[in-house]
Amino acid sequence: MRNKIYVTKEMPHEQQEQCCNIDVGKVIANDYKNNPTVFEKETKFDAFYYFRQIINSIIEHSKTRIVFTNLGILLEKDFSLDVPKFLLEYAKDYQVFILKGPFNIVDGNKLVWNIDKPENKIEFSQGVIESLNQE
């Protein structure tokens, strides 16, 4: 189903062939090493457009699923990125999965890294996130 974000502990081995796995933190950090001036505050930096460009360049278009990991970098305040919108752009064309990492699902619509720091969260509209692992 499109326009949903699935959260799972791991992708079943039999589904790996359909998946394009993207370590977001690693991909963006590698691009930063190669193009540090793009990220400078003095430049007109559009994180939404630029990060999509980076990720689109590595997506294998024969795949039907994208598995995102290591999303913390997207929460950097300097980027001012609308993370739900960013991820949902991919959910238009692919099944999007987020591997459950160091975060919790709170209230059914928030991925929260630290309960005590509410700014460390990604908040979706209700009904967008679906947990595939019952806890």
For the regions a language model picked out, list residue spans one by one.
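Extended, compositionally biased accessory segments flanking or bridging domains
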Residues: M1-E60, G108-D116, I122, I129-E135
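Residue-level preference for the first positions of well-ordered beta-strands
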Residues: R2-I5, R65-V67, Q95-F97
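Structural motif
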Residues: Y6-M11, G25, T69-E76, L99-P102
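Aromatic-enriched hydrophobic runs in primary sequence
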Residues: K9-E17, I22, I66-T69, P84, ...
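Amphipathic alpha-helical interface surfaces
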Residues: A47-I54, V67-N70, V83
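Conserved P-loop NTPase "ATPase switch" module shared by AAA+ and STAND
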Residues: I58-F79
